[in-house]
Amino acid sequence: MTRPTLILFLRVPAIGRGKTRLAKDIGKVEAWRLSRAMTAGVLGRVRDPRWRLVVRVTPDGALAGAEPQGRGDLGQRLQRAIRANATGPVAVIGTDAPDLDRAHIARAFDSARRHGAAIGPAADGGFWILALSAARARSVGFEGVRWSTAHACADTVTALGGEVARLETLIDIDDQAALTAWRARARGRRGPGAGPGRPAERPGG
């Protein structure tokens, strides 16, 4: 059996670039710090011998050893990356879901094997993972998807066609409301001692 491929879509953190909605709420420097923490956290959590990790970055060439995302909108870049790795099952993730771990990824691959496709909805209407069988990955397309809106997950399901299993909903941190919601959940899980600057307050931690 061909080992699955996990593709991490990554925007290399830089002050004033990316996380624009969050930066408007908490400032560019703090948004950059959070972005760095989330990126480091995901990179530390998702490596696993059960799958091959491919990192695709923007801007192109911004991270040594990573592959460029290239030109086009998000759908075009995702399509290229997925089809290029469709020798076996493929899943794609980003860095915005701080609760994402190896168990989530393993369940997504398992669902894709059974149903052909699986998607993990984000609380804001986007998605935190898309997993596809090799056959579905080879023909994947994202026509009509309204990216960076509350319709992105539903539009992606429509664009995929066929059966798509739905996984659990996770929080994607794109603005202050999502950050506040995530911190409240993290404090609830880790207890009342988790205050500012402690692990419950650090998405990558």
Short names for language-model regions:
Residues 1-22:
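N-terminal nucleotide-binding beta1-loop-alpha1 segment
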Residues 55-61:
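Short, polar loop motifs at secondary-structure junctions
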Residues 93-95:
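Active-site acidic Asp-centered loop
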Residues 100-126:
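Conserved donor-nucleotide/metal-binding helix-loop-beta segment in metal-dependent transferases, i.e.
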Residues 131, 135-157:
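Short, glycine-/small-residue-rich phosphate/pyrophosphate-handling segment
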Residues 154-205:
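Conserved alpha/beta core of the MobA/IspD/sugar-nucleotide pyrophosphorylase nucleotidyltransferase superfamily
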